[in-house]
Curated annotation (Swiss-Prot):
Subcellular location: Cell membrane
Name of the protein described by the UniProt record: CASP-like protein 4U1
Biased composition (Low complexity): 116-126, 135-155, 205-221
Family: Belongs to the Casparian strip membrane proteins (CASP) family.
GO cellular component, one term: plasma membrane
Region annotation Disordered: where it falls in the sequence: 1-239
Origin species: Sorghum bicolor (Sorghum)
Record's subunit section: Homodimer and heterodimers.
Membrane topology: Multi-pass membrane protein
Keyword annotations from UniProtKB, A to Z: Cell membrane, Membrane, Transmembrane, Transmembrane helix
Length: 461
C-alpha cells in the first residue's frame, strides 16, 4: 500500500502574553561585605626627661615679739575674754551670703575677729585666807595676823594688785575632842608607841574624834611648808566635855541597843536565852552521848561487828588449839597400834583406820593454822579487820572438816567393833578404841568452832 506524503504544519507565532498593569519591584541587591577599616597605629612617643627640681630656700623664721611689761609669770592662768559687740566691726547683710560671681565686684572681705589678749588672774595659792570667825586673841591671834600680813605682802610683791574675792573655804565644825582622847593624846606625846587595847570597841559606841599631833604640826611649821590656810585649819577650838557628852548621847540609843543585842532574842521573857538552862541541856546531851557510846548506839555497824568478833576470838583460839591437840593425839595413837606374831596386825591393813588417820592429820593442820591466825589478830591491832571471803572460808572448812572427822571416826569404830566381836579384845583393839574417843572429842571442838564461825559471819553481814 502506498504511503501518502505528509505536509508540514504552517508555522504560527505564539499568542501574546498579557502584561501586568502594576510594576514588579526589582529584586533586592545582594549585600556585599564591607572591607575592614585600616587600623592606624600611633607613632612611638618620645621619652622626655623628668623636670629638675629646684630647691627653694626655706622662709625665714619669724622672731617672737619681745615680751610686754605685763608678761605672765610661770604658773599663772590664762582666760580668753568673751568678744564684745563694741570691739568687732558691724556685719553687713550681704556679707552673710556667698558671691556667685554675677556681680561686678569681688567677694567682700570676712570681718576681722577682735584682738585677743591674755589676762592674768590671781592664782588660788596667792589668795588671802578668809577671815577667821573668831576674834584672834592671844598668841594664836598674833600668829594669824602675822600670817595674813605675810600673805598680803606676797600678793603685793607679785603685782596682783587688788585680789579677786576668795572662794568660801570649807571648814569642819563637827569635830570634837573628848577628855578620853585628850588623855590618849597626852599618852601619845609621852610614849612614842602605845600598846593597842586588848578589847575591841563596841559597835554601838561612837568612834573617838581624830587626834591631831601637835608635834608633827610644829615640825611642818618649822620646815617652811606650812601655809596660813593650813595653820588656820589645824587650830580648831577645843570643845568642852559637855558638848562631847551631848554628841555621844545623840548617837546612843538604849532601846535600839537592847533590841539589836546578840544576847536578846525577843521581847518576852520566854524567848530570852537562859544560860543556866543551856548548860543543863548541854550536860544532859553529853551524858546521853556517853551512854550511847557505851551501849554501842553511836558506833558504826562495821566497828560494832568487829568488836563482837573480837570478843569471841579468845574462845575460838582455845577451841582450835584443843582440836589440834586431840587430832594429833588421835592419829598418833592409831599409827602406833601394832602387834607382832602370827596374830599380829597393823592399821595400814585396814581401810577404815587409814581413813581416820588421814582426816585427823588434816584437821590437826587446819586447826593449828587457824590458831596462829587468831593469835596474830589478838596481838597486832592492824589485823583486826578481815575480809568477808575469810569468814566464808572459815565457816565452810569448819563444817566440812567436822563432817569428815565424824565420818572417819564412825567408820573406824565400826571396824573395831566387828574385830572385837569376832576375835576378842587385845592390845591393838584397845589402842584403836582410845584413839577413836580422842577423835570424837576433836569433832565436838571442831563443831563448836563451826558455830563461832557462823556467828562471826552473820555479825559482819
Amino acid at each position: 500500500m502506498a504511503s501518502t506524503p505528509r505536509t508540514p504544519a504552517p508555522v504560527r507565532s505564539p499568542p501574546p502574553v498579557p502584561t501586568p498593569t502594576h510594576p514588579t519591584p526589582p529584586p533586592p541587591p545582594l549585600e556585599t561585605p564591607q572591607p575592614p577599616l585600616p587600623v592606624s597605629t600611633p607613632p612611638p612617643a618620645l621619652e622626655t626627661p623628668p623636670p629638675r627640681r629646684v630647691r627653694t630656700p626655706p622662709p625665714p623664721l619669724e622672731t617672737p615679739p619681745p615680751p610686754s611689761p605685763s608678761s605672765s609669770q610661770p604658773g599663772d592662768e590664762y582666760h580668753t575674754p568673751a568678744p564684745s559687740l563694741a570691739d568687732g566691726s558691724p556685719r553687713e547683710e550681704e556679707a552673710s551670703f556667698p558671691s556667685d560671681g554675677r556681680e561686678g565686684g569681688g567677694a567682700p572681705a570676712p570681718p576681722k575677729s577682735p584682738q585677743l589678749s591674755p589676762m592674768r588672774l590671781a592664782a588660788p595659792r596667792l589668795l588671802l585666807p578668809p577671815p577667821s570667825p573668831r576674834t584672834p586673841t592671844g598668841q594664836n591671834g598674833q600668829e594669824e595676823q602675822e600670817g595674813g600680813a605675810k600673805a598680803a605682802a606676797a600678793g603685793a610683791g607679785t603685782g596682783t594688785g587688788t585680789a579677786a574675792p576668795a572662794r568660801q573655804q570649807l571648814r569642819l565644825t563637827g569635830l570634837a575632842r573628848s577628855p578620853s582622847s585628850q588623855r590618849s593624846l597626852a599618852t601619845t606625846n609621852s610614849s612614842p608607841s602605845p600598846s593597842p587595847s586588848p578589847t575591841p570597841p563596841s559597835p554601838l559606841t561612837p568612834a573617838a574624834a581624830p587626834v591631831v599631833n601637835n608635834n608633827s604640826n610644829n615640825k611642818n611649821n618649822r620646815s617652811g611648808q606650812s601655809t596660813p590656810k593650813r595653820a588656820a585649819e589645824t587650830k580648831l577650838p577645843l570643845s568642852s566635855p559637855a558638848a562631847t557628852a551631848t554628841i555621844a548621847v545623840q548617837h546612843f540609843n538604849p532601846v535600839e541597843e537592847a533590841v539589836t543585842s546578840p544576847l536578846h532574842l525577843g521581847i518576852g521573857k520566854a524567848q530570852r536565852l537562859d544560860h543556866h538552862q543551856h548548860q543543863h541541856q548541854q550536860r544532859q546531851e553529853q551524858h546521853a552521848a556517853a551512854a550511847a557510846v557505851e551501849n554501842g548506839g553511836s558506833v558504826p555497824p562495821d566497828v560494832a561487828a568487829a568488836v563482837a568478833v573480837g570478843e569471841r576470838r579468845e574462845l575460838s583460839v582455845t577451841l582450835r588449839l584443843a582440836t589440834a591437840v586431840l587430832s594429833l593425839a588421835a592419829f598418833s595413837v592409831i599409827a602406833s597400834a601394832r602387834t607382832s606374831g602370827w596374830a599380829g596386825d597393823y592399821y595400814a591393813h585396814h581401810l577404815q583406820y587409814r581413813y581416820a588417820v588421814a582426816v585427823n592429820v588434816i584437821v590437826c593442820a587446819y586447826s593449828i593454822a587457824q590458831s596462829f591466825g587468831e593469835i596474830r589478830r589478838l596481838i597486832s591491832p592492824r589485823f583486826i579487820f578481815r575480809s568477808m571471803s575469810s569468814y566464808y572460808c572459815s565457816l565452810f572448812l569448819d563444817q566440812a572438816l567436822a563432817y569428815l572427822l565424824m565420818s572417819a571416826s564412825s567408820a573406824a569404830a565400826s571396824r573395831n567393833d566387828l574385830w572385837v566381836s569376832r576375835f576378842g579384845t587385845d592390845a591393838f583393839n584397845r589402842k584403836i578404841t582410845s584413839a577413836l574417843w580422842l577423835s570424837f572429842i576433836a569433832f565436838l571442838m571442831l563443831a563448836l568452832n563451826a558455830l563461832i564461825s557462823t556467828a562471826n559471819l552473820f555479825s559482819m553481814l
